[in-house]
Amino acid sequence: MASPAIGQRPYPLLLDPEPPRYLQSLGGTEPPPPARPRRCIPTALIPAAGASEDRGGRRSGRRDPEPTPRDCRHARPVRPGLQPRLRLRPGSHRPRDVRSIFEQPQDPRVLAERGEGHRFVELALRGGPGWCDLCGREVLRQALRCANCKFTCHSECRSLIQLDCRQKGGPALDRRSPESTLTPTLNQNVCKAVEETQHPPTIQEIKQKIDSYNSREKHCLGMKLSEDGTYTGFIKVHLKLRRPVTVPAGIRPQSIYDAIKEVNPAATTDKRTSFYLPLDAIKQLHISSTTTVSEVIQGLLKKFMVVDNPQKFALFKRIHKDGQVLFQKLSIADYPLYLRLLAGPDTDVLSFVLKENETGEVEWDAFSIPELQNFLTILEKEEQDKIHQLQKKYNKFRQKLEEALRESQGKPG
């Protein structure tokens, strides 16, 4: 029996996508086994009729086979019920296959909340308008606030709250993040305003301060001075937000393309959800010497995809002195990196804290003229409602007094 031709198998395949092809036998009349279905035999490797079949010739033919052309390969038939997939090269990156047997709205691992545990009391906003944690709109003069978790909202938004109180059993406690356990805690009962007189330094003084700062920095987060006199560096901001924040619901995280093209994923949906951030979470930002406090707040909200108004928040600088903690609210035009440069890299000397803007100071210059006119319209409406309620209250009181007087006139006194 003649040996099979080069590139053939001595046994038939069971799943051949096409009828087997036979080549001319080298020495006998018996047809060789069927050819390999996914491989094409080059013409140069097929020996002519009457060629020598010695062992050396076969070895030389097997030793240096030519590469198989891609067009001669036959694709495997796709099994019914499966989608065709591309075959990746060996060693190439394979995307992670993450699947879930649950749909997002029906995921049993996500506990359903119904707005339970809140203990709302009336709050008078004397310093200026506040912000509703549910709808995000301004709250003027009168609001409702939970005594436990500080959730603030309009009176008409009370029935629409679905977020449970995180401190149902009592007053709000600090739910700290893992980063906060690495730093010692001091007495934070003292909050005073610290006023400092600062003079703009020269470029030579800035260079000396940057060299001194980098020599004391131990985490490779130094500052770099540019030729135009500006410099860049890192700051850490502690997030101490007791009230919930609002984020868009049902969208994917921000990709590199969105960050480069400045695409806001929150603008693609109108669905909103609220949750509580861990107290004292730490976020690191890379900013320049021209970055203001307002830009730092907007950058933090963008990183967490928070859609609340930036005026709802304020940036404070925290100074540790004599075992006490002194807070000072920074103006929206201050430069945090310059303050970091003056204080040095030690966070025990100076640190930045993001909190709710509830100091009673309102930046009226940040509002547009239509917004200010809207404030006046809402205030006038609330004033008329209060006047109507007072008139109705005292009218009922007068009617009861008159009825009591009429009843007392017929009785001997």
From Swiss-Prot:
Coiled coil: none
Gene Ontology MF, one: zinc ion binding
Outcome following mutation: residue 234 to A: Reduced interaction with HRAS
SUPFAM superfamilies linked: Cysteine-rich domain, Ubiquitin-like
Biased composition regions of type Basic and acidic residues, renumbered to the chain: 52-74
SMART domains in the cross-refs: C1, RA
Phosphothreonine modification, residue list: 347
Residue ranges occupied by any Ras-associating domain in the UniProt entry: 265-359
Outcome when changing residue 303 to A: Strongly reduced interaction with HRAS
Keywords assigned by UniProt, alphabetized: Apoptosis, Cytoplasm, Cytoskeleton, Metal-binding, Microtubule, Phosphoprotein, Tumor suppressor, Zinc, Zinc-finger
Stored Pfam families: C1_1 (PF00130), Nore1-SARAH (PF16517), RA (PF00788)
Boundaries of every SARAH domain copy: 361-408
GO annotation, cellular component aspect: cytoplasm; microtubule; nucleus
A GO BP entry: lymphocyte proliferation
ZnF (Phorbol-ester/DAG-type) intervals: 117-165
Modified residue annotations for Phosphoserine: 177, 274
Keyword S-adenosyl-L-methionine listed: no
Residue numbers spanned by region Disordered: 1-103
Subcellular compartments: Cytoplasm; Cytoplasm, Cytoskeleton
Subunit structure: Interacts directly with activated HRAS; a RASSF5-STK4/MST1 complex probably associates with activated HRAS. Interacts with KRAS. Probably interacts with Ras-like GTPases RRAS, MRAS, RAP1B, RAP2A and RALA. Interacts with RRAS2. Can self-associate. Interacts with RSSF1 isoform A. The RSSF1 isoform A-RSSF5 heterodimer probably mediates the association of RSSF1 with HRAS. Isoform 2 interacts with activated RAP1A and ITGAL/LFA-1. Binds STK4/MST1, inhibiting STK4/MST1 autoactivation.
Stated role: Potential tumor suppressor. Seems to be involved in lymphocyte adhesion by linking RAP1A activation upon T-cell receptor or chemokine stimulation to integrin activation. Isoform 2 stimulates lymphocyte polarization and the patch-like distribution of ITGAL/LFA-1, resulting in an enhanced adhesion to ICAM1. Together with RAP1A may participate in regulation of microtubule growth. The association of isoform 2 with activated RAP1A is required for directional movement of endothelial cells during wound healing. May be involved in regulation of Ras apoptotic function.
Name used for this protein in its record: Ras association domain-containing protein 5
The organism of origin for this protein: Mus musculus
Name of encoding gene: Rassf5
